[in-house]
Amino acid sequence: MSRYFGTDGIRGRVGQGLISADFVLRLGNALGRVLAQGRDTRPMVLIGKDTRISGYMFESALEAGLVAAGADVQLIGPMPTPAIAFLTNTLRADAGVVISASHNPHDDNGIKFFSAMGEKLDDATEAAIEAAIEAPFLTVDSEYLGKVKRTRDAIGRYIEFSKASVPRGFTLRGLKLVLDCAHGATYHIAPMLFRELGAELVTIGVDPDGLNINAGVGSTHLETLAATVRESGADLGIAFDGDGDRVLMTDAQGRTVDGDDLLYVLARAWRASGRLKGTVVGTLMSNYGLEQALGTLGIPFIRARVGDRYVHQALVESGGVLGGEASGHLLCLDRATTGDGIVSALQVLEVLRHEGLTLSQALLGLHKVPQKTVNVCWSGPARAAVEMPEVRQALVEAQAAVQGRGRVFLRPSGTEPVVRITVEADDVVLMQQTLDRLADVVRDAA
């Protein structure tokens, strides 16, 4: 088991445990040493971040650790996570680092890495970095210290990359959209891009102050977006999370359109156009109704472990190009190397424009079963919850209660100190009763 890395890098409360300036300094030094092994030239690393205030502190710590190990650094500043993945590849860097805690509040932060190809690091490289952290801090001789510079054209590069993901003649003229940028990393780029494509925009969540990221806005708080869509008469709403790798939408009536819905819209249209390849990949949490709807269309569907890195792995293994999670992590591997909220939103909008459909019309063939998830806070290691006898027994009873009519999942979060409980069933009362009973047992055991 990894000592430091979770399902999406390293994440936690600022100033506690691993999310401290001294640890991040050592982490940067470890990365620099791993990248320098077996080469005569200095490795080059990109560093990007979201808008939370602690990003400045960790950016400086990473920079110092990398430079001390002899690595050059390019500072990108506030940019979406997928933009760092793209820039790492296109600028021929040896690695990319993102300072972000995604959809978490401002007092959390985290570090995630990308390979030279703009993909999440493999387990072997993560293990090498962890081993290097335990070694003494390295400062190379002065003449071999790394250099630091800022990249000035990152925004323009990423906007052109995103626009290139849709046909050249594609425009959004005549569409009124509400964009919710979560006061996060997309706050400046997303409005610029969608206006360049001709959309009439109403924007929310575009005034970051370092403390308001994800605060009542973004993909985890769709209430503001839904209300703004209804009040403004917009055609639909688009919400990103704090680092821009997730996207959710609302239709013109303000109804939530989650990642499962968006997967269906894309899979159905791409199959008809011939763009869909291989298998569509969801996760263990994907709604059963999605699996049924895709099956009706003759589209193969498999489930990976929860986490976009596992969806990516399953897509590569199955030769697929489309996958994702209900949370809004969508992978369009024929357009981007990682989950990209802006690129994914453009793919959905391109389908709607091509087919002449509204978002609600594009979803008419999907009938999801009632599903609900609750998070139960867990003071100790969340993984211990699933091993407790009373919790295991309650899980068995819950699964028996919905057998043949739904599914029950209980899993520790890979990014937060919570246990996630999900129940789906063909009857909403059965679903809620089963969820309540299981959640009560987990809370009592916490």
From Swiss-Prot:
GO biological process, one term: UDP-N-acetylglucosamine biosynthetic process
Cofactor binding note from Swiss-Prot or TrEMBL: Binds 1 Mg(2+) ion per subunit.
InterPro entries to which the protein is assigned, alphabetical: A-D-PHexomutase_a/b/a-I (IPR005844), A-D-PHexomutase_a/b/a-I/II/III (IPR016055), A-D-PHexomutase_a/b/a-II (IPR005845), A-D-PHexomutase_a/b/a-III (IPR005846), A-D-PHexomutase_C (IPR005843), A-D-PHexomutase_C_sf (IPR036900), A-D-PHexomutase_CS (IPR016066), Alpha-D-phosphohexomutase_SF (IPR005841)
CDD domains documented for this protein: GlmM (cd05802)
Entry keyword set: Isomerase, Magnesium, Metal-binding, Phosphoprotein
Modified residues (Phosphoserine): S102
EC number, UniProt record: 5.4.2.10
Record-level GO cellular component terms: cytosol
Record GO terms (molecular function): magnesium ion binding; phosphoglucosamine mutase activity; phosphomannomutase activity
Pfam families, per the entry: PGM_PMM_I, PGM_PMM_II, PGM_PMM_III, PGM_PMM_IV
Taxonomic superkingdom: Bacteria
Cofactor needs: Mg(2+)
Reactions mediated catalytically: alpha-D-glucosamine 1-phosphate = D-glucosamine 6-phosphate
Active-site residues, record numbering mapped to chain: S102
Post-translational events: Activated by phosphorylation.
Gene3D superfamilies: Alpha-D-Glucose-1,6-Bisphosphate, subunit A, domain 3, Alpha-D-phosphohexomutase, C-terminal domain
Annotated PROSITE patterns: PGM_PMM
UniProt KW Isomerase keyword: yes
Entry-linked HAMAP family: GlmM_B (MF_01554_B)
Family to which the UniProt record says this protein belongs: Belongs to the phosphohexose mutase family.
Cited function: Catalyzes the conversion of glucosamine-6-phosphate to glucosamine-1-phosphate.
Name of the protein in its database record: Phosphoglucosamine mutase
